[in-house]
């Protein structure tokens, strides 16, 4: 399969790589759309880590459902790129982002788990979400950044009538402004 990886400061390289196979029940996805996150830009600007295949805001079609019996080939899905332990206090309370293991094998954020700047990617089966009919692949890529924005707004405990300052006009900031309304 074709993929794009970091090859140096502000440099990418288009290369061939083996298509991922299901490991530990992971779901294999034919990537149809992938967002560009601010963290992707930081990696590109720094040129580190060399070899990283970025892309953690993605949507596509199931080609191998792995251990998910409720998924079938052809289902439209998106995935959460994280890899929480599901055992610690943070995970047990649903706060996966605070798990110390969440980012160790994150899709498109670690050298161990290639992201969606590729024709195919893999994702933990418990982190896959079906895309409702009528939602485009491009819109489905916004699930992850939407969750980040919504979480930030919820942490702020904004009430009706509050004045809110959001610093940053990127996608996270714009979504936070919408959620804060």
Question: How should these model regions be labeled?
Answer:
Residues 8-10, 23:
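Residue-level recognition of beta-strand termini and adjacent short loop/turns
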Residues 37, 71, 80-129, 133:
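Cysteine-cluster motifs in flexible loop/terminal segments that predominantly coordinate metals
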Residues 7, 18-19, 50-55, 108-113, ...:
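Short Gly/Pro-enriched turn/cap motifs at secondary-structure boundaries
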Residues 135-181:
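Mid-domain Rossmann-like dinucleotide-binding core that forms the NAD(H)/NADP(H) cofactor-binding site
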Residues 39-43:
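Cytochrome P450 core scaffold surrounding the K-helix E-X-X-R motif
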Residues 19-34, 45-92, 132-134:
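Glycine-rich beta-strand-centered segment in the early N-terminal region that forms part
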């Amino acid at each position: 399969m074709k993929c794009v990886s970091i090859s140096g400061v502000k440099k990418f390289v288009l290369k061939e790589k083996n298509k991922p196979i299901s490991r530990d029940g992971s779901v294999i996805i034919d990537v149809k759309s992938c967002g560009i996150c601010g963290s992707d830009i930081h990696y590109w600007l720094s040129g580190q880590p060399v070899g990283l295949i970025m892309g953690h805001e993605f949507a596509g079609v199931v080609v191998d459902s792995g251990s998910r019996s409720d998924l079938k080939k052809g289902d439209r899905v998106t995935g959460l790129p994280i890899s929480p332990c599901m055992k610690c206090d943070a995970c047990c309370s649903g706060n996966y982002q605070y798990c110390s293991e969440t980012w160790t094998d994150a899709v498109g954020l670690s050298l161990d788990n290639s992201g969606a700047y590729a024709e195919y990617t893999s994702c933990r089966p418990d982190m896959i979400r079906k895309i409702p009919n009528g939602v485009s692949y491009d819109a489905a890529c916004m699930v992850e950044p939407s969750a980040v924005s919504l979480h930030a707004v919820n942490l702020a405990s904004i009430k009706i009538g509050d004045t809110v300052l959001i610093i940053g006009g990127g996608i996270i900031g714009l979504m936070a402004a919408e959620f804060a309304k």
